[in-house]
Amino acid sequence: MEGDMIVVTGATGHIGNVLIRELNTRRQIVRALVLPNDDCHPLDGLEVEIIRGDVTDLKSLESAFVGADIVFHLAGIVTIMPSMKKVLERVNVGGVCNVAKACRTSGVRRLVYTSSVHAIAEPPHGTVIDESQPFDPDGVLGDYARSKARATLVLLDEVRKGGLDAIICCPTGVIGPWDYGISNIGQLILDFASGYLKSYVRGAYDFVDVRDVANGLILAAEKGQTGRHYIFSGAQVQVPELMKELERNIGYPAPTYEIPAVIARVAGVLASVYYRLIRRRPVFTAYSIDVLSSNSQVSSARAREELGFTTRPWQDSICDHVNWFRSEGMLPTRS
């Protein structure tokens, strides 16, 4: 990759800005594609050329990709809210179509696409999720996961046609610092700190550090096999464990009241409507409750063996995430 021109779409997002930070440490030439109205504060102080554009606008992509050797496509919509099917299809699926076309016409040597572990059909509990399971829009939970599954299948089809060298990376739940846009887990941390989080739902999720994902994407660009996909997972964390870790790092007691998942799911349906009305990001929805109850045994063995992917302890990631919010003056205090 040394000396290559690299383009990052979704550059102001959590993974995007951390990827650019890592590329900067390697003295790579980086161009960031950001939306016309995007706040570029996450890129402040970084060595990067900023280009305004939109993955739904093919011409803007072709302009942004001129002279590019490698494209990291991270732009997309991540949501746990319902009723967003059309915009998810337009941005997540249509965006991949446009990126693939622009890579062809611009002569991009390699495309690294960030999909999601949720795009992979979920096997029964007790079965480890790995790359042997297919990308299946009908075998995943929620409109977001379906859009990522369809987008991934579109890209794999483009690779099969020939003339496009693309690799797919599938992170689990991303945690860690530089969370400017406040991710779903970031919102949970802030709600815990403010005292807004009064209860919890038993379940589990796999978390991986954003810095390890950024490094994994670079490894995929360097070592990945064309048309192959790699899962980036870290550790399966039970919700009570997460609450205790937040208690340790933030200094306030964790909620002790456990809501049964069945009741929480019903409440989640109503919560989606409520949060939409007050224009606040939800702590939970019916979809997020389903995810916590789903299979979260995930293996990154392929990425570790073929790419050299490594991860740090999830507790360190939570600590760094909390401390970053604190250093930015974003962590609430209780009166």
Region annotations inferred by a language model:
Residues 38-44, 48-94, 102:
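NAD(P)H-binding glycine-rich loop region in Rossmannoid oxidoreductase-like domains
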